[in-house]
């Protein structure tokens, strides 16, 4: 008996009716087996991941990043790993994938019967940068389902003719390179999907598409994200990696809750525990104050008495007082402790000399945006003034970063402008072989170094992390370095390319506040709805036909 696979969603109108009629007729006659094709690959049985007492220690500092993690991940769960920058999220993800990690010691047990996985890393792997699209999709991959591949390309508005091109993956925009990885990995047979910051470089429409895919697929998804909206709409289990006590103690929390419920529960528990700790402390202080008065009275009476019989009675009473003191101290050990919280980052601009509000810095009049001979957008019109905060959105590959580079060239020619720039690819500015202190230092003087260390500490860098090579830091920590560099340089105009892309939910509000209160002008490319709404005074969508004004409320429609 043969079989026919039908992707019903790709057919329309009369052709759908004809093929459906013929297929069902043949099936009834016993000539074919009929099945409906879904994006999900078929699997047999239930698959679980059992984690028992998993601890991951960084060898360089002998510091735990994951502490005694035990949990069972059921088939189909959507597990989000969250935590501050540098807390070990990517390390945990790679450990669950079975990767070898020579810089870490892993203790504990991970049991999994999964046979196939798909993985999209936080950064485009070096080995892919020089691969052509043709080789990636047709030579390197033998297990792709091409019906799914082309369907995904259509959904993501990626021209499938480009699959056969000789364009190198490294030449794609950040969003496009992430799109082709999504298409490639989701077209493979897999039982578990691992994603490391999947929404970082995607345009708003594609982020919404990815949310929907994660909710729909039957396979297990384990992912890292700093995007609170993304977390709220996808995760049903939270693994929270925390480093408390000045980043010296690891705490690993697991809750089988959606992100909003988890956040609400944590806030409620924090308030409840804080109140109980305060009540216990007041009761303890009151008991101890009463005890100290009794003890002081007995001591005074002992010193004053000259009667031996009274002295013996007082000595016996003092013995009882001291025994009671030990009981109080022992009981104090079971008092509710004040909850430990990771410290929020503290960073702000000072002594900025902004340009006049009305000063026109850039005037684009019907200009084209091009790369080599290829026109990305035409009829560009834009006026930029001294203290405006302009957000630019648009689909992946439309040329937003190219536009930012064009504006950077124009602003660099203005003598009155002190320009600060934060690229999407941090390595464009960072010197990876230097330590954070060495990178930020300009004079090497003691006073400057102390100031830098103080600033780094306010961004939750531990002292050892200040001494490590920048290449060993997480993406979020590298982003913090660029932010601090901007603050120390005191520019009066900023160009930002996806400035919030690697920062944790705890840091995000502080970063939005940092730029919202910045007195100078800003032009930023961003896909972060909250950032755009809280920071920008005007927003434009870049299209092939120019820049369109966007209403802030339309970002949520």
Segments (PLM) and residue ranges:
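Pre-Walker A (P-loop) beta-loop-beta motif of ABC nucleotide-binding domains
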Residues: 68-82, 115, 218-219, 380-391, ...
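Walker B catalytic motif
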Residues: 197-198, 203-205, 495-499, 503-507, ...
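Coupling and communication elements adjacent to P-loop NTPase active sites across diverse families
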Residues: 45-58, 144-167, 265-373
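ABC-family P-loop ATPase nucleotide-binding domains
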Residues: 115-177, 188, 424-485, 489-491
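Conserved H-loop
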Residues: 227-233, 528-534
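ABC ATPase nucleotide-binding domain signature region
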Residues: 78-84, 90-146, 242-247, 386-451, ...
């Amino acid at each position: 008996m043969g079989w026919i696979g039908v992707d019903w969603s790709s057919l329309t109108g009369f052709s759908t009716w004809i093929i459906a009629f013929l297929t069902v007729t043949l099936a009834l006659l016993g000539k074919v087996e009929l099945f409906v094709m879904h994006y999900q690959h078929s699997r047999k049985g239930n698959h679980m991941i059992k984690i028992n007492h998993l601890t991951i220690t960084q060898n360089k500092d002998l510091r735990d990043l994951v502490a005694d993690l035990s949990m069972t991940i059921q088939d189909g769960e959507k597990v989000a790993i969250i935590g501050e920058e540098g807390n070990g999220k990517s390390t945990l993800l790679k450990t669950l994938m079975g990767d070898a990690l020579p810089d870490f010691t892993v203790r504990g047990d991970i049991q999994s019967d999964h046979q196939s996985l798909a993985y999209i890393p936080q950064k485009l792997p070096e080995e892919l940068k020089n691969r052509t699209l043709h080789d990636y999709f047709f030579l390197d991959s033998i297990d792709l389902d091409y019906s799914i591949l082309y369907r995904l390309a259509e959904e993501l508005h990626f021209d499938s003719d480009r699959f056969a091109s000789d364009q190198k993956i490294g030449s794609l925009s950040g969003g496009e390179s992430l799109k082709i990885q999504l298409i490639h990995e989701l077209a493979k047979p897999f039982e578990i999907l691992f994603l490391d910051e999947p929404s970082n470089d995607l345009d708003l429409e594609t982020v919404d598409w990815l949310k929907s895919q994660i909710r729909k697929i039957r396979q297990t998804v384990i992912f890292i994200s700093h995007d609170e909206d993304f977390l709220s709409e996808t995760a049903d289990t939270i693994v929270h990696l925390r480093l408390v006590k000045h980043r010296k103690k690891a705490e690993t929390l697991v809750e089988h809750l959606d992100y909003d419920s988890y956040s609400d529960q944590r806030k409620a528990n924090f308030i409840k525990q804080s109140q109980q700790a305060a009540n216990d402390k007041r009761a303890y202080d009151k008991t101890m104050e009463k005890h100290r008065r009794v003890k002081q009275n007995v001591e005074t009476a002992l010193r004053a008495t000259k009667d031996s019989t009274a002295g013996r009675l007082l000595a016996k009473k003092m013995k009882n007082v001291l025994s009671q003191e030990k009981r109080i101290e022992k009981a104090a050990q079971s008092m509710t402790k004040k909850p430990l919280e990771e410290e929020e980052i503290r960073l702000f601009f000072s002594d900025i000399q902004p340009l006049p509000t009305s000063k026109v810095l850039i005037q684009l009049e019907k200009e084209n945006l091009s790369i080599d001979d290829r026109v990305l957008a035409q009829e560009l019109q834009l006026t930029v003034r001294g203290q405006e905060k302009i957000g630019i959105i648009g689909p992946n590959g439309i040329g937003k970063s190219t536009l930012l580079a064009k504006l950077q060239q124009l602003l660099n020619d203005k003598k009155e402008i002190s320009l600060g720039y934060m690229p999407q690819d941090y390595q464009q500015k960072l010197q990876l072989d230097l330590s954070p202190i060495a990178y930020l230092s300009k004079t090497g003087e003691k006073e400057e170094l102390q100031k830098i260390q103080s600033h780094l500490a306010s961004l939750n860098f531990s002292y050892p992390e200040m001494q490590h090579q920048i290449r060993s830091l997480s993406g979020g920590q590298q982003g913090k370095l660029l932010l601090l560099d901007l603050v120390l340089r005191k520019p009066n105009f900023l160009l930002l390319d996806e400035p919030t892309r690697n920062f944790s939910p705890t840091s995000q509000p502080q970063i939005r506040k940092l730029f919202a209160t910045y007195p100078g002008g800003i032009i930023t490319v961003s896909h972060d709805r909250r950032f755009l709404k809280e920071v920008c005074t005007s927003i434009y969508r870049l299209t092939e036909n120019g820049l369109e004004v966007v209403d802030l409320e339309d970002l949520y429609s």
